[in-house]
Structures are given as structure tokens and as C-alpha cells.
Swiss-Prot record:
Protein name, entry field: Enkurin domain-containing protein 1
Major location (coarse): cytoplasm
Keywords of this entry: Cell projection, Cilium biogenesis/degradation, Cytoplasm, Cytoskeleton, Microtubule, Phosphoprotein
Role noted for this protein: Microtubule-binding protein which regulates microtubule organization and stability. Promotes the stability of astral microtubules and facilitates the proper orientation of the mitotic spindle. This allows the oriented division of basal keratinocytes and contributes to epidermal stratification. Required for the assembly of both primary and motile cilia. Destabilizes the interaction between CCP110 and CEP97 by competing with CEP97 for binding to CCP110 which promotes the removal of CCP110 and CEP97 from the mother centriole and allows the initiation of ciliogenesis.
Length: 348
């Protein structure tokens, strides 16, 4: 089926048995890529062995090649699945460590600390005592003698041979005689003929009369309950007198706030009756203008009344006509500014 050697070249060499003469390689290449040709017998003719008289070299193997080969035979599953020193492979598992005994460790450390402390105490006791630091003393007392030293140097009145008589413990330190004791009265049992001292008293009648006059005392719990009920009654009376039926102060404040907000919204909204290009005159300015117009009207009327009735000159007639015209204008302005809303044209 194959017609001659293949012309396709690639990384995988073709089968050398198809065309042995064409695909023959040197011994070095055969040992490195295809294995030893003499061992694999890929080239069947014996005449090919004489072509290269040099014996082929053994394949080069790295130092870890045997380990890799053994690992491939056994598999790597046991190595990957070693859990806590327990191997799943055929190899022997390592020895497990015994759990640490913390109690023994703590006792050992405590004994060591105690031993060290005892050694320090022993060394401190054997060491020489340190000299005491002298207390500070003012230089002005250098020439003053010690009173204790002076008392010790004075000779005592008693000789050294005579023993000193000192008070001993639990000895009497007062006078030699004990203090006189008041004799206690002896109780004598009354005889059958003895009478009770004093007049006879009827204690039963006395106790009954005292019990009637004594006030009745209640228990502590009943007194506390009465005080609590009285406080509740006073609180209810105060509530009925001051708060019941009255609107709370916070509701009144909230009502005023709502009213001011509504007025502000109403003022901020444009008036539908206002013509375009106009603005509403403020209320205080409208009232001031109206008062000035009323004063002007009263002044013009006074001037008109003071005119002479029989004056028919041209000047008098023109002055009367001027006053009438001003009065008409003032009356028209009074009618306009007497309205609740006055719109003024804005300056363009």
C-alpha cells in the first residue's frame, strides 16, 4: 500500500521497518532516540552491524532515575493521601508521636522554680549583711548629747548584787488591799403568812382600760398601701384640674407651625387675579399710601371750601378747576388703594 518512503517530516519518527535502508540512523542517534538498534533488532540485516564497528554506549540515566522508576511502579496515590502520619500505600507508616503530658511538664517547671528560689534564699542568708545606711541628721544637733546615753551612764541607787523588783505579768498594780465590795441583798422566800407589799391593784381592769384608749396600729404593708393610694388620688386630681380637657402645648405649637407654613405657601404662590408684568404691593406700603391719599383729600377739600364764592375771575375759575381735577384723581386713587389687593406694574 505504501509507495516509497514518506516525505512528511515531523517530531515523531516513522516506522523504520517500512524502509530500513532509507530510515537508517547512526548508532548514537539510535541509542538516544530509538533505543539500542542491536538490542531492539530494528535493523534485521547483520551486515548493518559492520557499518559501525564502535560499540554503542549505554543510555545515560540521571541519579534520580531509579527512584522515579520505582515510584512509577508503585504509584503516587499513597504518597498524596498520607493523612496525619497514616500512609495508604504499601510503605511502612512513620511512628506516631505520643501526646504531650502538660501536667507533668507544669509540675517539673514548678519544682524547678521552687529549687531556684530556695537556692537564692540560701545564698542570701550565707551572704554578708549589708551595712545600714546612716540616717540624715541636722548639723545643729552635733553638739547635743543623747539623753538615753546620759541616763545609762548615771550610777543607779541600787547595787548590782541586789535583784531589782519589777512588776510581773498579771500582778496587782494598785494598793495592797482589795477594794471593798458592796454586799448584794439576799433574796428570802416569802412565807405563807407574808403579805404583798403595798395596796392591791387590779391589773386586769387596768390593762383593759389601757387597751381601749390605745390607738389602733396597722401593719407596715397597710400603711404603705394607704400612702400609695393617696398619692395616686392626688395625681389624678392634679391631672383633672390642669390637663384633662385641655389641648397639650406641643399640639398648640404644631398647629401654629402648620398655620405659618400654610400662609407662607399661600404668599409664595402667584395670585391668579394678578395680570402679567405686575407684582403685588406689600400690605404696609398700601396702608401708608392710603393714609397719605386721605390726608391729601382732606387738604384739597379745605382749600376748595376756603375759596371765595363770588370770585368769577379767570384765575379763580382755573384754580377751582385745578382743585376739582386733583380731587377726582385722589378719589380714584383712594378707591384703588382701598382694595385688599393692589398690583403694581414692574419696571422693565
Amino acid at each position: 500500500m505504501c509507495e516509497g518512503p514518506s516525505r512528511i517530516s515531523g517530531p515523531i519518527p516513522p516506522d523504520p521497518t517500512l524502509c530500513p535502508d532509507y530510515y537508517r540512523r547512526p548508532s548514537s542517534a539510535q541509542g538516544r532516540l530509538e533505543g539500542n538498534a542491536l538490542k531492539l533488532d530494528l535493523l534485521t540485516p547483520d551486515t548493518d552491524r559492520d557499518l559501525d564497528a564502535t560499540p554503542p554506549r549505554a543510555p545515560r540515566i540521571r541519579p534520580g532515575g531509579l527512584e522515579i522508576l520505582e515510584r512509577g511502579r508503585r504509584g503516587v496515590g499513597g504518597v498524596l493521601l498520607q493523612l496525619g502520619g497514616i500512609s495508604l500505600g504499601p510503605g511502612a507508616s512513620p511512628k506516631r508521636k505520643d501526646p504531650k503530658d502538660h501536667e507533668k511538664e507544669n509540675m517539673r517547671r514548678i519544682r524547678e522554680i521552687q529549687r531556684r528560689f530556695r537556692e537564692q534564699e540560701h545564698s542570701r542568708e550565707q551572704g554578708q549583711s549589708r551595712p545600714l545606711k546612716a540616717l540624715w541628721r541636722s548639723p545643729k544637733y552635733d553638739k547635743v548629747e543623747s539623753r538615753v546615753k546620759a541616763q545609762l551612764q548615771e550610777p543607779g541607787p541600787a547595787s548590782g548584787t541586789e535583784p531589782a523588783h519589777f512588776l510581773r505579768a498579771h500582778s496587782r498594780c494598785g494598793p495592797g488591799l482589795p477594794p471593798p465590795r458592796v454586799p448584794s441583798p439576799q433574796l428570802t422566800l416569802p412565807g405563807p403568812s407574808a403579805k404583798a407589799p403595798g395596796p392591791g391593784v387590779d391589773f386586769i381592769t387596768h390593762n383593759a382600760r389601757t387597751a381601749k384608749r390605745a390607738p389602733r396600729r396597722h401593719s407596715r404593708s397597710l400603711q404603705v398601701l394607704a400612702q400609695v393610694l393617696e398619692q395616686q388620688q392626688q395625681a389624678q386630681e392634679h391631672y383633672n384640674a390642669t390637663q384633662k380637657g385641655h389641648v397639650p402645648q406641643y399640639l398648640l405649637e404644631r398647629r401654629d407651625l402648620w398655620r405659618r407654613e400654610a400662609e407662607a405657601r399661600q404668599h409664595s404662590q402667584p395670585d391668579p387675579a394678578m395680570p402679567p408684568g405686575h407684582t403685588r404691593m406689600p400690605e404696609n406700603q398700601r396702608l401708608e399710601t392710603l393714609s397719605s391719599l386721605l390726608q391729601s383729600q382732606s387738604q384739597l377739600l379745605r382749600e376748595l371750601v376756603l375759596l371765595p364764592a363770588g370770585a368769577d375771575s379767570l384765575r379763580a375759575q382755573s384754580h377751582r378747576a385745578e382743585l376739582d381735577r386733583k380731587l377726582v384723581q385722589v378719589e380714584e386713587a383712594i378707591k384703588i388703594f382701598s382694595r385688599p389687593k393692589v398690583f403694581v406694574k414692574m419696571d422693565s
